[in-house]
Regions:
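Short, basic, glycine/proline-bearing loop/turn elements
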Residues: 3, 123, 156-162, 254, ...
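Metal-dependent catalytic core segments for phosphate chemistry
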Residues: 142-160, 244-249, 308, 314-340
């Protein structure tokens, strides 16, 4: 048996440790430079699961068990193998596989399986999430087209949304909007811009955007990265990146434009302070993490802006924040009046838009 991980985003990889908790001992196959990030994300997930179960059990007199523990994560890692892309790897006479770049996030890949029975070979392609091949995001690698497979199990995130535009024009407009919000809110109004962001990929992309906006500017905003997991992934990127991406990332990290907040006490101090700044914190959907404390502080503040930069599921706190007509927001059973400004940048998606999906699949 084999388990294939197309990429390390939580919705595609963070149930794998549970499979090992339940007794599985199959090898997990992922692309090169993915294992350390998978480890960091899975350990963080285990910690959150164990912590939340303790709270729920205590408050409701239950005896729930966490999805998995840190020991299950380490068991998974014992069986996790990194494999190179664009190389057909033969398992036996009947099965081979190839990992092909998907252009979604760092290390994302499509999985092409070759099944040979009675001398006849058929192929199955599992795309995982596919990136935007026209605009693309930094530190990702380019999407690579697979010319043919007998059967395709393909992503369709925007398969019913031809109205969503994420092209070059939309990206430029969003970058202009991003810069305008920062300079109006921070430089002119001495306020704050709070950015809920996914720890993996989106936060690093935002940091590079900010660096490139202001590296040659006389005025630079104060920028905080307030998330232990995000910081670990920044460190992983320093080890994983190669070529021009590595050069650009190292230049960004050497710029001293960013302050990384690891300790909880420093995060609490930042929440309580009135310093005009940009704060990037996780989680992107605002369902957990330090971002919730920043939102409690900033949602009632008319001199604060929440900038939403990613997908949010219906009913998540992030989706509620996108509704500018809401009068109140409830966080941790406490209601807060909505006085902050709220904006969305829609072109930063790591997913292929509708018309690219049509082109990829036809």
């Amino acid at each position: 048996d084999l388990i294939f991980g197309t990429h390390v985003h939580a919705d595609h990889s963070l149930l794998i440790p549970k499979i090992y908790r339940d007794g599985c001992r199959a090898a997990t196959i992922i692309s090169e430079n993915s294992k350390q990030i998978l480890k960091d994300m899975a350990l963080d997930s285990a910690y959150i699961s164990e912590r939340d179960v303790l709270v729920i059990n205590s408050q409701h007199n239950k005896n729930y068990k966490p999805l998995y523990s840190a020991s299950d994560v380490y068991k998974m890692l014992e069986y996790t193998l990194e494999k190179p892309v664009n190389q057909k790897i033969v398992i036996d006479d009947e099965l081979a596989f190839e990992l092909i770049p998907a252009g979604h996030i760092l290390g994302s890949c499509q999985v092409k399986l070759y099944f040979t029975i009675d001398g006849t070979t058929k192929t199955l392609l599992v795309t995982g999430d596919l990136g935007n091949k026209i605009v693309g995001n930094r530190f990702v690698g380019k999407y690579q087209q697979v010319e043919y497979a007998d059967v395709v199990i393909g992503e369709s995130t925007y398969g019913d949304r031809p109205d969503i535009k994420t092209g070059i024009k939309e990206r430029k407009n969003d970058l202009d909007k991003f810069k305008s919000i920062i300079e109006t809110q921070i430089h002119e109004m001495n306020g704050r811009v709070i950015i809920p962001s996914f720890s993996m990929s989106r936060s690093q992309q935002l940091a590079l955007m900010l660096y490139e906006m202001y590296k040659d500017s006389d005025w630079k905003p104060k920028i905080y990265i307030d998330s232990p997991l995000t910081i670990k992934i920044f460190e992983d990127y320093e080890e994983c990146l190669e070529g021009q991406d590595k050069i650009d990332f190292d230049n960004m990290m050497a710029s001293n434009m960013f302050t990384f907040i690891k300790e909880s006490e420093d995060s609490k101090y930042l929440v309580a302070s009135n310093e005009p700044c940009v704060i990037i914190s996780s989680s992107g959907m605002c369902q957990s993490g330090r971002i919730r404390h920043h939102l409690k502080r900033c949602i009632p503040d008319s001199n604060a802006t929440v900038l939403l930069v990613g997908f949010s599921t219906e009913g998540s706190l992030a989706s509620l924040l996108k509704d500018n007509k809401r009068k109140t927001i409830t966080i941790d059973q406490k209601e807060y009046p909505c006085r902050c400004a709220s904006y969305s940048l829609k072109s930063l998606s790591g997913h292929a838009p509708f018309w690219q999906l049509v082109d990829m699949y036809t």
